[in-house]
Amino acid sequence: MDIEGVRMVRDYVQEVTGLELKEEQLEIFSRRLAERISELGFETPFNYYLAVKHRYKDTELVNLIDKMKISETYFFREEDQLVALKEWVIPKIARKAGNGPIRIWSAGCSTGEEAYTLAILCRELKRENPEFAHLRFTIIASDINEIALDSARIGKYSHWAIRHLPPRFVGTYVSTKNGGFEVAQELREMIRFIPVNLNDVASWDERRDFRFDVVFCRNVLMYFSDRRVPEIIRGFHRVLEGDGYLFTASTESLMRHTTIFKPIKMMNTFVYTKRET
């Protein structure tokens, strides 16, 4: 396959979305792209590139983004962070929030495993603590990949995706169905799945509902270039309340990109809070 044509397609998607596909990932992307080009009947990656750029951008870009998806996601990933959220962060916010809802954003939610995990934690906090039984939560889960969002809204998962889900939650928050698992309706009702391009930070300011107490953006920033990451982090700083918290993956340090957040050791993990600027 024409590797230069593949790179042109990759570079175009990167220009529009900010998603960066490393050279070592190009072979996987090339195979997926070849299948798509064959499905549509194009002769070369270059012809496909021209068609996407000038004729089919709105429809075909969705498929291209899906082809670039290489990461894995699953329920209850990095449990130390989840414990810190449930046992420390939410109680601290709740004691200041009064009767207002606690707003959580799962940015780059992919097929929804993280968002549903957050919903389970919120339900469990209310169930276990009478002090917090009155709490209301709003969870926004976003991704640029609309195919992934459609899957998230359906809420059906494989055994592999829920392999870290505590067994006591099976039957309560997920049920077996047709050889897989389906999340409970009460969880789906807690989450709004919406398309958001993290590369287009300016568009966040146009959304009136984009103010959050907690932002989760884990295993996402690694897909953006070093040039784009600081701008995305500044966007998180703007949409977080003054006493809000930002969670990134334990392998993703913000300190090499910016100093507008400060890390706080919390239980067995680190989270970030805003430095006021």
Segment roles from a protein language model:
Residues G100-G112, I140:
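Conserved class I S-adenosyl-L-methionine
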Residues A107, E128-F216, V220-R228, L254, ...:
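Extended basic-aromatic, gly/pro-enriched interface segments that bind polyanionic ligands
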Residues H257-T277:
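Core SAM-dependent methyltransferase catalytic element
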